[in-house]
């Protein structure tokens, strides 16, 4: 009788352990990323799954979604359950912190202001550069039509807007009326305002809209050198001066703690700082921080003087309130351009 009880207890304990292990293995975490990161995380995610299994002995599943980072942030605020964010706009993470979804000091939780990699705004032009586009000044010409995403929904496009603003701010020695007029002309020349970066790429490279696509340097190089639009023979233009675009990452604490995914989520974001992933990021033409990788890829990137928007325009709260909130300068300039 005692033997039967012991065996039954062992069987129950084994079943419980198996169930708990299975539950832990099957608990997925959700990464919400920006619109043009599909191919990048299509590589990173399976590499992390393998890495996690080697480190922990457990399986992990990653649920992945893509959209303009501002749209992603709004969806999360409205109840979308996401464990980590890998965005292209710091303010889109800040707004989640303000809503109590993650900690206020999220940018201190990982190196380099929680930005494993960075980029800048560059231009893509038609074969032979028929409009002779060299820099920001060319974007206000009457004969030039532009394509970039809507800054109201896309972090990518906010950097395009800020790149134009920061260039004009230097050009006109801070004369705000002249700066506004310059950026207003840029916006007036926009032929198509898709909600996200991928839509802008398709509009320009596939549908033939516009003379210049403004997007991240990484995307510009990927489009020009990739197979998808190879027949179009598109060309890269990197202006001499442009905006520093940091790509922030964060754990959505409220969700990760509720679902018990913090350990996996933290490891996933730390993984992006590893040498192997930093090398992978440069293959997608992102600029990175790992010293050995930076040295090995110096020739890959065009020289450009990067302006940190926070050093000129203040905090992201200030920038968002002044430029991108409803009724801000962006809305004013768009209304004037209609």
Residue ranges of each PLM-predicted region?
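Bacterial N-terminal signal peptides that target proteins for export
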Residues: 1-9
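Ligand-binding pocket segment of bilobal, Venus flytrap-like solute-binding proteins
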Residues: 172-239
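A conserved helix-loop-strand patch within extracytoplasmic ligand-binding domains
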Residues: 97-170
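Early extracytoplasmic/lumenal segment of secretory-pathway proteins
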Residues: 23-99, 109-110
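N-terminal signal peptide c-region/cleavage motif recognized by signal peptidases
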Residues: 18-20
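Extracellular/periplasmic juxtamembrane helices and adjacent flexible linkers that interface
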Residues: 256-338
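Alpha-to-beta junction loops
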Residues: 79-85, 143-145, 207-215
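A bilobed periplasmic-binding-protein/Venus flytrap-type ligand-binding module shared by bacterial periplasmic
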Residues: 120-129, 246-263, 280-284
């Amino acid at each position: 009788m005692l033997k039967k009880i012991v065996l039954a207890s062992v069987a129950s304990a084994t079943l419980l352990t198996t169930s708990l292990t299975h539950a832990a293995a099957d608990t997925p975490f959700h990464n919400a990323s920006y619109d043009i990161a599909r191919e990048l995380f299509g590589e990173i995610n399976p590499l992390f799954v393998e890495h996690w299994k080697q480190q922990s002995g457990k399986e992990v599943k990653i649920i992945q979604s893509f959209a303009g980072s501002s749209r992603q942030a709004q969806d999360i605020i409205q109840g979308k359950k996401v464990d980590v964010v890998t965005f292209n706009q710091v303010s889109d993470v800040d707004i989640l912190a303000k809503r109590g979804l993650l900690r206020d000091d999220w940018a201190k939780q990982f190196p380099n202001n929680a930005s494993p990699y960075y980029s800048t705004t560059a231009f893509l032009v038609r074969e032979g550069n028929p409009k002779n586009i060299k820099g920001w000044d060319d974007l206000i010409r009457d004969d030039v039509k532009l394509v970039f995403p809507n800054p109201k929904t896309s972090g990518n496009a906010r950097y395009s807007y800020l790149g134009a603003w920061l260039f004009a701010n230097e050009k006109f020695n801070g004369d705000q009326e002249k700066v506004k007029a310059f950026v207003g002309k840029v916006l007036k020349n926009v032929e198509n305002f898709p909600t996200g970066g991928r839509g802008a790429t398709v509009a320009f490279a596939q549908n033939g809209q516009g003379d210049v696509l403004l997007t991240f340097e990484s995307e510009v190089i990927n489009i020009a050198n990739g197979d998808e639009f190879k027949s179009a023979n598109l060309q890269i233009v990197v202006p001499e001066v442009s905006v520093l675009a940091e790509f922030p990452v964060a754990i959505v604490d409220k969700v990760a703690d509720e679902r018990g995914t913090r350990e996996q989520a933290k490891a996933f974001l730390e993984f992006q700082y590893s040498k192997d992933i930093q090398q992978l990021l440069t293959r997608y033409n992102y600029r990175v921080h790992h010293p050995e990788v930076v040295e090995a890829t110096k020739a890959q990137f065009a020289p450009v003087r990067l302006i940190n928007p926070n050093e000129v325009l203040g905090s992201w709260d200030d920038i968002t309130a002044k430029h991108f909130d409803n009724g801000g300068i962006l809305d004013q300039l768009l209304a004037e351009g209609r």
